[in-house]
């Protein structure tokens, strides 16, 4: 269920990447682009944290920022093992 929800949330991002973004010149100052960052963050971290990371990234992407390489942060290790692992 979780993977399906993640894919559903990423669907509008993919629509933007393939249908809307090609109509405009490249403007993102970061690598990967903000849309690619959003899709990767949601798939890697889940919907809530992924959208939070994406929102922070989009707010940082403006004409006065330096830009550059800004990858999605790695998933932090779990502090406690889940009950299913025992």
From Swiss-Prot:
Family: Belongs to the UPF0161 family.
Subcellular location: Cell inner membrane
The protein's role, per its UniProt record: Could be involved in insertion of integral membrane proteins into the membrane.
Alphabetical keyword list: Cell inner membrane, Cell membrane, Membrane
Record protein name field: Putative membrane protein insertion efficiency factor
UniProt topology in membrane: Peripheral membrane protein
Pfam families reported in the protein's UniProt record: YidD
GO cellular component assignments: plasma membrane
InterPro entries assigned: Membr_insert_effic_factor_YidD
């Amino acid at each position: 269920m979780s993977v399906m929800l993640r894919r559903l949330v990423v669907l509008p991002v993919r629509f933007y990447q393939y249908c809307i973004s090609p109509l405009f010149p490249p403007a993102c100052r970061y690598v990967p682009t903000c849309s690619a960052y959003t899709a990767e963050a949601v798939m890697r971290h889940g919907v809530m944290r992924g959208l939070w990371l994406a929102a922070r990234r989009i707010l940082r992407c403006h004409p006065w920022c330096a830009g550059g390489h800004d990858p999605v942060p790695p998933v932090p290790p779990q502090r406690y093992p889940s009950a299913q692992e025992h």
